[in-house]
């Protein structure tokens, strides 16, 4: 089983990563990342702010990040992706409290999609950046990052699936990031968990809760190491429960009553 998640805009490069007795890994697609960096380096703060719809302060920060980005990744200029990303999904995942065995399992069974890096293993080193997959960054391959990455992410996902031993892909990414995957080119059974929260008597997807729940589902996978879709249905973290009637063969619906 392979799970995919989105990255996060919020990063933490100040807190040291947990000290495990194994080495971090190198991101595989940095030659492509360098091409994107070279394009992004050409923008002024005002141009970058306009492209990304971010504040002047954030634009200046990211102009500096692009300028400082290096092709060589090491412990001095980079941090393992699993511990660098912060945000709602990663709050639910709570990576800092994973055991060594769970992190090693994640290295095989979890991937993060990324606008700059394409696809990251949890222990892949990454440098601070902001480049969302939906950014309309004109590049030699087209008008946006979906055109830039083309089949590359899908091919590397297929390789990861082949290496981990079965054909179940659990899509816990946002639509923006999953748009960079070409499911028709994957030899996979793609499962999409959906998390609905009760609001005023009706169940609906509430972004903040859904993101956190995706992270909790990743945590569940790392802790229980399921090998079948049936085992995924046992997910009950955060008071969610599986709704058989609302679910389909590839869409698993989990619901939670309104919180008091």
Curated annotation (Swiss-Prot):
GO terms for cellular component: cytosol. One of its GO terms (biological process) is response to hydroperoxide. Disulfide bonds: none annotated. It holds the Pfam family H2O2_YaaD. Belongs to the UPF0246 family. This is UPF0246 protein APJL_0596.
